[in-house]
């Protein structure tokens, strides 16, 4: 056995084994800046009302100045991507919708687009189904941004804004419940189309919302935009320029607030977005204030898109015609919420043994997807949401991986917060709008 200041070495049956002795600790200490004696380490989270979920921030402070910040994630890991490998392709929609729980319809749409690309049926998706997807995603974008404005304002002291933001979001959730049967975790967008059609009463409620929301946005701006404390807490705080965003892969409102108009709905269109008229809001300051203005402007643009989508809705099927892929979507749920009348069952399952067998195999085993791999990216409220789906030719995914914007954007927090005040960590972190369900998944 030999020894050194750093490790001991010994021979074993498996080969050389080194044991670290820590003898170099004195060298580390001697090289430490004496000013570090005044620094303390503080844990913010994982149970903290201002970290947008179970996020842990490890802060090294010198007085009230943040010298070092580390994000610790993983507290909300649910193993969704792994679980999808044991479910058929349609059942995957019920898993992905639970990741970013504030933007479930984006998770579902990205997944459905990836599966449809593997199947080679992108051109078979009906116009009505595609329009409904755009309609639902833009309503979801509005509700997500409303939560951001509400929670960020609350964290910076404007509690009344939280009440107003959640009040308007409730209106959107009622629309979702009317269309999908659920307020959240819808599993509504599925490979081949959507689960069922949009009822007429939902269209009337959407038009009421389109009339209401612009007035509420004006109230938000009156409440916050000219408020001196809000301006002081957001302007020149959490600054990250376009170069920093690109270096770290940051996308979404954070990137657009730095002056780069990168929006996948414009640059790499999907779901027919190239046929809609809307603008991509940008700002130039790259601070919390700029991100606030960009998100409010995006709500206005989404309202335009929702109105165009509603006007475009034409009667027609909402699921592909191929019965080897399509789950029944032509019937609405009955007033009893069940829809299990004899007529309902007869239309779905048919009236022969062969039809029943086909329906049973489609639901339990699922359809087969040709072997291959694809990547599909869409513009979610927090940035680029990407799906890498791999098929080995079976009825279940070989691998499904999500490029989650919350996870990617969080790595920019140290660059935004280090050198600033601890109070500005709250504003900077909130401006990234992380949702830990999506980040940790």
UniProtKB/Swiss-Prot annotation:
UniProt cross-references to InterPro entries, sorted A to Z: NADH_Q_OxRdtase_suD, NADH_UbQ_OxRdtase_49kDa_CS, NDH1_su_D/H, NiFe-Hase_large
Enzyme class: translocase
Function field: NDH-1 shuttles electrons from NADH, via FMN and iron-sulfur (Fe-S) centers, to quinones in the respiratory chain. The immediate electron acceptor for the enzyme in this species is believed to be a menaquinone. Couples the redox reaction to proton translocation (for every two electrons transferred, four hydrogen ions are translocated across the cytoplasmic membrane), and thus conserves the redox energy in a proton gradient.
Family as reported in the entry's similarity comment: Belongs to the complex I 49 kDa subunit family.
Topology versus the membrane: Peripheral membrane protein
Gene Ontology cellular-component terms listed: plasma membrane
Subcellular location: Cell membrane
Name of the molecule in the record: NADH-quinone oxidoreductase subunit D 1
Gene name per UniProt: nuoD1
Subcellular location, principal: membrane
Listed EC numbers: 7.1.1.-
GO molecular function: NAD binding; NADH:ubiquinone reductase (non-electrogenic) activity; quinone binding
Description of how the protein assembles with itself and partners: NDH-1 is composed of 14 different subunits. Subunits NuoB, C, D, E, F, and G constitute the peripheral sector of the complex.
UniProtKB keywords: Cell membrane, Membrane, NAD, Quinone, Translocase, Transport
Reactions catalysed: a quinone + NADH + 5 H(+)(in) = a quinol + NAD(+) + 4 H(+)(out)
Keyword Transferase (UniProt): no
